[in-house]
Amino acid sequence: MKILTKFFLLLVVTTCSLHYYCQIGQCSTQLQRVCHYTTPSVWDELLVEKNEFYREQLNPKVKVLKSHISQINSHYQDKVLPKLVDLGNRFYFDIVSPRIDNVCEFWEEFELKPYRERSLNQIRKVRQRIWFYYSVYLKPNLTKLDNQYALSDKYGKVHNKIAPFVAEIAQNFQNVYHQAAAKVHPHWENLRRTVNAKWEPISSSLWQRCRTNEICFKTNAQLKNIWKNLKLGCDYLSIYVHDALSPYSDGLESNVRATKAKSKSKPRVNASASARGNARAGAKAGAKAGTSEISASATADPTTSASATVTAGFEDDYDDEEPLYTSTSTIMLTVTMSTDQNELSPSQNTANAELGISEQDAIKDEFEAWFKVVDQKSSGVVKTFNKEVNKYLHHRVQQLDSIFQNKTKTVSEVLQNRYKNLNRAIQDINCTCETDTGAGNQTCFDSTGTTQLSEYITRSKMRELFAEAHSTLDQSMLQLKQDLEPIAQEVESRVSLIREEMVEVYEEWGDAMVSEWSKRLAYIDVVAGHLDDNGASTDEESSENWRKFLNLKKQVIKARDELAEHPADLHEIKQFVKKVHYLIEVLAKEAGEYLYILRARANLAFQAREQESKQREDSPRMDRDSTQNVENSNTTTASAEKSGKKAKKVKRVAQNGTNSTEKFSAGPDSSSKEPSMETTVQNNVTLQI
C-alpha cells in the first residue's frame, strides 16, 4: 500500500510539473500531447461524448460537483484571498521591511577594514607557518628521499609514459565538452529567454523600488564595491598561486610540450624550439639592456600582465596552431621585471632568487617557531612518558582484573564443593544402622532411611574432611599470592622498555633537529653575509641565534636526562595489587568462619547421635527396673487388700458383738438365743483365722 501511495504521489507531482512547464515554456509536441491527455476536462468531454453510462449517470453529479467547486472558488476569491493579501502586505510592511531597513543601515555603518586586516594577518601567519613546516620537516626529508631513491628520475620516466595518454584524454574530454555545449546551448538560450521574460518585469519593479529607497540604493552600491574587491582579491590570489607554482608548472608544461612534439611533425618542433630560443634571447637581451624593457614593464599593470601570461601559457599548451611563443616570452619578461627601477641591483636580485620574498622575516619566524617546537617537545617529553605508562598500566590492569576474577571464581567453586561435601557428611551423621547377625556387616542409611551411605561417619572421618577443606583453602590463597608476585617484575621491565624506547626516539629527534638547524644556521650566516652591508649587526644577530641554539641544545640534553631518571607513576598497579591482597584476606576470613560454623554443627550432630545411642543402650535396663517396680507395686497392693479385708472382718465382729449385747440387754427369748449362738460360733471362727 505504501508503494502504491508513493507511486501515485510521484505520478501526480510529475503530471503537475509537466503542466506547469507547458504553461510557462515552449515544450515539445510530445509533451503537449501528454499534457492534453492528462487534463481532467479533456477526459470529461471524451467520456460524455462516447460513454452513455457516464453521460447519463455520472455527468450530472460531476456537474453538481463542478458547481460546488466553482462556488467554493468564488467564495475563496471574494472572502479569503483579499484577507490573505492584506495580511501578507501588513506582514511585509510591518515586519519584513523594517528588518531589511535595519540590516541595510547596519551594513552601511559596518566597518570592513579591521576584519579585512585581521583576515590578511591570519593568512600571513598561516603562510609563514606552512613555509616553516615545509622548510623544516618536508623539504629535508623529501630531499633525502629524492637523493636516496632518485624519485625525480622515476617521476620523469613515469610522466613521459603517462603524459601522451593524459593529453589524449584531455583532448577527447575537450571535444566531448564542446559537443555537449553545442547541444545544450540552444536549450539553455530558450530557458534563459523564458526566465528573462518572466523575471524581467519583477526585477525591473524591484529595481525601481530600490532606486527610490536611499538605503537600498546605498546597499547595492556597497555590495558592488565588495564584489569588485573580492574579484580583485581572487585575481591577486591566482597571480600569487601561479607565481608560487611556476617552478613546478614550467617543468610540467615542458614535459607536455615534449610529448606533444614527439607526436607531431618535425617542422612544428623546430618552430617551437626556435620560438623558445627567441624568447630566451629576448629575455636575456632585455635583462642586460634594462632601459627600454624595464621602463615599459614599470608602467605595465601587474594584473593584466599576469593574466596575459596565464592565457598565453594555456594557449601554448593546448593550441599549437597559433605561434604565440614570442608574445609569451615578452609577457613573462614583463611579470618578472615589474619592480622599481631605482631598487634594481644584481646582488639584490641574486639574494631574492635564493631566499624568496621576505626571506629575513621568514627566517625569524622559523627561528621562533623552531624554538617553540623544541621547547614544547622538551618540556612535554616527561608528560608523554607518563601518558604512555598510564596507558600501558590501564590496559594491563584490565587484563589482570579479568584474569584474577576468573581465578577467584575458580577458588570459590572449589571451596563450594568442599562445603557441599561437609554439609552432606554433617547430614549423614544422623543415620540409621543395621547389623547383619550372620555376616557381621553393618549397613547405614540416611535420616530418611531411603539412601544407603557409603560409610559410617565418625569423628575421625569428619576431622579428615575439615583438614582437606583447610588445606584446599590454604593452597588456593597461596597460589593467588604467588600469581601476584611476578606482576611487579613484569610491570617494571615493561616500564623500563618504554623509557628506553622514548629516550632513544627523543635522542634521534634531538640529534636530527640539532644537526639540521646547525646546518641551517651556518647557511643563514653565509647568506646574511652577502645580504647585509653592516657586518656588526649581522654578527650580533648570528651570535644571538647561536646562543639561543646552544641553550636549546642544553635543554634537549637536560630533558633527555630527566626522562631517563624520572620515576614512573605505578599508582594504578599498586592499587590493583592491594585490592587483590584485600580480596584474598576477605576470602580466607569468610571461608575460615564458615568452616568454624560447619565444625560446630558437626559437633552438635555428633553429640545428638551419641546421646541417642546412649539412650538406646539404657532402655533395656530401664525396662527391667520398671518390671520390678510393677511387681513390687502389685505385691504391695495385694497385702494392702488382705489387711483391709482383715480390718473389715474385725470391724464386722465388733459390730456383731455390739448387736448381741444390745439384744441380751433387751430380754431373753427363744428366737434371740439362736442368733447369738451363731454369732458366737462365727466370732470364734474369725478369731481362729
Curated annotation (Swiss-Prot):
Instruction: Supply the alphabetized keyword list.
Output: Coiled coil, Mitochondrion, Ribonucleoprotein, Signal, Sporulation
Instruction: Name the source's superkingdom.
Output: Eukaryota
Q: Where is the composition biased (Low complexity)?
A: 270-308
Q: Where is the composition biased (Basic and acidic residues)?
A: 610-626
Composition bias, Polar residues: 627-637, 655-670, 677-689
Determine if Mitochondrion is one of this entry's keywords: yes
Asked if the Swiss-Prot or TrEMBL record annotates the protein with the keyword Hydrolase, the reply is: no
Please give the coiled-coil regions recorded for this protein. Answer: 406-435
Signal sequence bounds: 1-18
Q: Which SUPFAM superfamilies match?
A: Apolipoprotein
Region Disordered: what ranges? 259-308, 610-689
User: What GO cellular component entries does it have?
Assistant: mitochondrion; ribonucleoprotein complex
- GO annotation, biological process: sporulation resulting in formation of a cellular spore
UniProt subcellular location: Mitochondrion
Family of this protein:
Belongs to the SHE10 family.
Purpose of the protein: Involved in spore wall assembly. May be a component of the mitochondrial RNase MRP (MtMRP), a ribonucleoprotein endoribonuclease involved in the cleaving RNA transcripts to generate primers for DNA replication in mitochondria.
**Complexes and interactors:** Component of the mitochondria-localized RNase mitochondrial RNA-processing (RNase MRP) composed of one single RNA encoded by the NME1 gene and at least 31 proteins. Absent in the nucleus-localized RNase MRP (NuMRP).
What's the protein called, per UniProt? Outer spore wall assembly protein SHE10
Which organism is the protein's source? Answer: Zygosaccharomyces rouxii (strain ATCC 2623 / CBS 732 / NBRC 1130 / NCYC 568 / NRRL Y-229)
Q: What is the primary gene name for this protein?
A: SHE10
